A protein has these predicted regions:
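N-terminal periplasmic/intermembrane-space "pro-region" immediately following the signal or transit peptide
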Residues: 2-48
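Outer-membrane beta-barrel architecture
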Residues: 29-30, 72-74, 111-113, 161-163, ...
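Outer-membrane beta-barrel translocator domains and adjoining extracellular loop/strand segments
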Residues: 54-61, 66, 95-106, 135-141, ...
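Residues that define the transmembrane beta-barrel architecture of outer-membrane proteins
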Residues: 62-69, 103-108, 154-158, 218-224, ...
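Aromatic- and glycine-enriched pocket-lining scaffold segments that form the walls
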Residues: 146-242
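Predominantly the C-terminal beta-signal and adjacent terminal strand-loop region
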Residues: 326-355
Length: 355
């Protein structure tokens, strides 16, 4: 696939107040040409579009299109020295309120925070979960292609996050959030089933037997995340690590480890992320799409269970000139059903890109 991107630069990373990008002026400053004195309201517009040409190797056909990758409105500010807020809304997603949190999927952020002092703060509302990895925290306007696993992470949830800045370079967080934005039946459909992970095949009649269970809603479908963002050697080495335990359904859980490391030099930036997720219920549905129709073609609403996803993602950025940079990105991902001999490695994907 080839793409010619056009972007309107704005801040907008997924962490905190989204101020990871530098030299970004607010809409007020761009329009009035005056320096903004107040911190109460900063308005940003994030917009990215591209012309894409794609070849489908299965059909041997080329297709082209103009594609609106992202369009969102963002407002950030400090109302007092202690109270801050962030609002981010995508104009390319549904505005219908979800059944669990009553927020629309279009709303990424509607967060209010209280800063107790230089060390402690608390945030609440809808926000991006405090997950590790550097790919997760990138402004989507500047991402040519996400990894499959990252592309399946729905991170904007109603949450409460406690943040502790031990030093200016070491931050720790503890967060409780909803696992879903909708009810279980809205996420997986009526009478959904999940495999227990046990799949047996008979060599005599060439049949496959799949052990399944009916999904039941959990009383407390919540996620618990512990995170660490660190900087060393004046910010030249950075980390974004997290561990998450999610309640997916009754007696169905997910464990997620995300470890991001980044080398951040003056003209060279390079990160390596490792992600591992072990799901009792295939929340990302990647393995389910590959295996369920083969394992149990008679089932109409079945999801894989005991699924493990692993991924390595790396990205290199080299600043060639003030307005020019070279980027190269690679990823390697696997999905497996750990308790099935037949599907211990069900999907494997690797990809590279440079631009």
């Amino acid at each position: 696939m080839a793409a010619l991107p056009v972007s309107a630069m704005a801040q907008g990373t997924n962490d905190g107040l989204g101020g990871g990008d530098v030299d970004i002026k607010s809409l007020y400053e761009l329009v009035t040409k005056h320096e903004q004195k107040s911190k109460a309201l900063n308005i940003y517009i994030n917009y990215g579009t591209s012309y894409q040409t794609t070849r489908d190797s299965r059909e041997g056909e080329w297709t082209s299109r103009l594609y609106n990758r992202d369009l969102r409105l963002e407002m950030v500010g400090w109302l007092t020295d202690n109270i801050y807020y962030r609002f981010r809304h995508r104009l390319t997603k549904s505005n219908t309120a979800e059944s669990e949190d009553n927020f629309a999927k279009a709303t990424d952020y509607m967060m209010v925070g209280w800063k107790f002092n230089d060390h402690w703060s608390i945030q609440g509302g809808k926000k991006c979960q405090a997950l590790g990895s550097f790919e997760f925290d990138e402004n989507t306007l500047f991402v040519y292609q996400f990894s499959d696993i990252e592309n399946c992470i729905e991170s904007s949830k109603a949450a409460i996050n406690l943040v502790y800045n031990a030093t200016p370079d070491q931050q720790f967080s503890a967060e409780i959030s909803n696992t879903y934005t909708g009810k279980l039946k809205d996420e997986f459909g009526e009478n959904a089933k999940v495999t227990t992970g046990k799949v047996t095949s008979s060599s005599d009649d060439e049949t496959t037997t799949v052990d399944t269970q009916l999904l039941e809603k959990a009383n407390h479908p919540l996620s618990y995340t512990a995170g660490w963002n660190g900087k060393f050697f004046g910010g030249k080495l950075q980390t974004r690590w997290s561990y998450t335990l999610r309640t997916l359904a009754k007696h169905k859980y997910s464990r997620m480890v995300r470890l991001g490391q980044k080398l951040n030099l003056d003209h060279l930036h390079w990160y390596i992320d490792y992600n591992m997720t072990y799901d009792d219920l295939d929340r990302m549905r990647i393995a389910s799409k590959e295996t369920v129709s083969v394992m149990a073609p008679q089932e109409t609403n079945l999801y894989a269970g005991k699924v493990r996803y692993q991924g390595l993602v790396t990205k290199l950025e080299v600043d060639l000139a003030p307005d020019w940079k070279f980027e190269a990105k690679g990823m390697y991902e696997t999905a497996s059903m750990t308790q099935s001999e037949q599907y211990k490695t069900t999907a494997r994907r690797s990809a590279t890109s440079a631009h």
